[in-house]
Design a protein with these regions (language model features):
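Conserved nucleotide-binding/hydrolysis micro-motifs of P-loop NTPases
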Residues: 31-34, 68-70, 118-122, 155-156, ...
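Conserved GTP-binding G-domain of TRAFAC-class P-loop NTPases and closely related GTPase folds
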Residues: 122-204
Length: 204
């Protein structure tokens, strides 16, 4: 089974910047430039079928979907004229099925990082992935589908806290680490004794 990792953060917090040192494939849901000089080969699509095909066919052991939240937004906007609540169930189901595909159909050495904006409740301070509102949140708890959720704050990752960040016990030495997905990738592979990206890790 593959491993999905959720990376949350506000715009400008360093989510996309964390990709810089990682040898990976990148799927852009919307076309925007990365915030650093790079030679990454990227594919831009919000089509779930194409994304699944790319995940299956990619030779990279680590793949980033940036920004995964726009999968929901894009489908919602394309279907904005549809009436009724069924479309929210379908939106939730499509996103849920993508995560299920990663965890059940991809090889174990594949790690897929889904970058999303965060939404913080002004009253409770609770942080969750930014979706398209309560009608979708009632259908699926996005963060509940992930064992590893990293929160990006001021160009650092929170790995465990009382909020949304979580990771398996002793995967990371501290609750706060640098926002470098190459470091995260190595920690995950070491923790689960995974193959993949070994030569790239040694070269960096």
């Amino acid at each position: 089974m593959g491993i999905p990792v959720l990376v949350l953060g506000r715009s400008g917090s360093g989510k996309s910047r964390s990709i810089k040192n990682l040898d990976c494939g990148i799927i852009k849901v919307i076309e925007k430039e990365l915030p650093f000089k790079n030679n990454f080969k990227t594919v831009t699509t919000s089509d779930y079928v194409k994304i699944i095909q790319i995940l299956m066919g990619s030779k990279k052991d680590s793949i980033v979907i940036d920004d995964a939240g726009y999968l929901l937004t894009d489908e919602f906007m394309r279907r904005a004229t549809e009436k009724g609540y069924d479309k929210f169930t379908e939106l939730a189901n499509n996103f849920y099925n993508l995560i299920q595909f990663i965890t059940t159909k991809l090889p174990r050495e594949k790690i897929v990082y889904l970058l999303m904006h965060e939404d913080e409740n002004e009253i409770t301070g609770q942080v969750k992935p930014k979706t398209i509102g309560k009608l979708l949140d009632e259908k699926v708890c996005v963060e509940g589908m992930f064992t590893i959720v990293l929160r990006c704050i001021e160009h650092k990752f929170l790995t465990n806290n009382s909020g949304c960040a979580k990771s398996p016990e002793e995967m990371f030495e501290t609750e706060e680490i640098e926002n470098d997905l190459n470091v995260v990738d190595k920690a995950i592979r070491d923790y689960y004794n995974l193959g993949g990206n070994e030569n790239d890790q040694q070269a960096k």
